[in-house]
């Protein structure tokens, strides 16, 4: 259901861009989705995207290969030693504080996030952005949030997240975000718990 819905978003955005001759970016992360997952079960919608677009052979993560450092590296284009988010949990000696992805106060503290993520750059240029659970967007980094953002809540169904993104792309031009970043915690959570080749992980894929 998830992969079918995400494919629908991409098709809808393509139609929107064609109709209005404008540029939009949707960045989707399915955490822990290994490159070879596309080959261990049927993924017809990903196959369509691969056939009509492009598919890489893999992705080399930054070290350490954890969720928060890598997602923030994607957003900033920086290595972890430069943007400062060096792990999911760590002690920041310069701030004399402990950071944890499970601690709401630190997650929302912009002082932990170095560099300039893409949504901050865009907002400063007058380009509206939106995020559904992307790492870093809950903090006011350099005093800036995305125009639309959500506090992380893993219990929010994937379908609800997708519906929200579709709604954002349907907003009036003056309020419509041109960059949207969407995060799903699967298949990472299931893959860690049951293993990458388990039937439960395959079901998530």
What does each model-found stretch correspond to?
Residues 10-19:
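Hydrophobic h-region of N-terminal signal peptides that target proteins for export
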Residues 37-38, 192:
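Short N-terminal helix/helix-N-cap motif within the alpha/beta-hydrolase-1
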Residues 2-10:
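Sec-dependent signal peptide recognition
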Residues 79-204:
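His/Asp/Glu-rich, glycine-adjacent segments
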Residues 39-83:
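Short, structured active-site-proximal loop/turn typified by the sulfatase FGly-forming signature C/S-X-P-X-R
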Residues 10, 34-35, 59, 106-107, ...:
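A generic structural signal for short
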Residues 22-34, 49-50, 74, 122, ...:
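Beta-strand elements within well-structured catalytic alpha/beta cores of enzymes
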């Amino acid at each position: 259901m998830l992969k079918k819905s995400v494919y629908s978003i991409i098709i809808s955005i393509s139609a929107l861009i064609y109709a209005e001759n404008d540029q939009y970016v949707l960045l989707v992360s399915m955490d822990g989705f290994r490159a070879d997952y596309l080959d261990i079960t049927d993924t017809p919608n990903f196959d369509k995207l691969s056939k009509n677009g492009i598919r890489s052979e893999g992705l080399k993560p930054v070290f350490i290969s954890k969720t928060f450092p890598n997602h923030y590296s994607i957003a900033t284009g920086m290595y972890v030693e430069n943007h400062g988010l060096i792990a999911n949990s760590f002690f920041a000696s310069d701030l004399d504080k402990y950071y944890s992805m499970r601690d709401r106060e630190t997650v929302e503290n912009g002082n932990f996030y170095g560099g300039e993520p893409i949504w901050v750059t865009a907002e400063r240029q007058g380009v509206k952005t939106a995020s559904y659970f992307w790492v870093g967007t809950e903090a006011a980094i350099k005093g800036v949030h995305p125009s639309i953002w959500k506090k992380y809540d893993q219990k929010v169904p994937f379908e609800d997240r997708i519906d929200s993104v579709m709604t954002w792309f349907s907003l009036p031009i003056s309020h419509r975000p041109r960059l949207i970043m969407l995060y799903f915690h699967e298949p990472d959570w299931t893959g860690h718990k049951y293993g990458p080749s388990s039937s439960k992980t395959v079901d998530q894929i």
